[in-house]
């Protein structure tokens, strides 16, 4: 196990993210496997860790509408749809300034996170964060970040830190709504 692997300080987490590292962290839905969404090397690590099909886009967390507008092309109508969401929802939008490894056809699924831990992270980290479920592609999501070695096996060595908040995350994933289609299309409920 790496030094300060479990529950490192926010300062250490920022160093990891800025250095192209990967973390397991709590979101408002599931535990996420995350990295700096603008860093291609970090994204390649997540593809490897998850055994994910190359070219499949990742969900991306942003701090607020200001950050969202830096990384997505956003109309007033789309902003209104995002503001009206009653539960955690990823919205597919045209992406900009994001690594092409995080997008598909120049689109990505963005979410303004309501998770308390993620909100704290955004006080220190001012870039979008990939937040794909912490699991191998096609498998059940991790419900306890301390079980990462069981889930990821030898690929666990590619993970730089895990944050455990004491809450087992057995919720379902977030909704996905495509705002690039007319009418808007619900991809996952």
Q: Language-model features: where?
A:
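Active-site-adjacent structural elements in enzyme catalytic cores
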Residues: 1-189
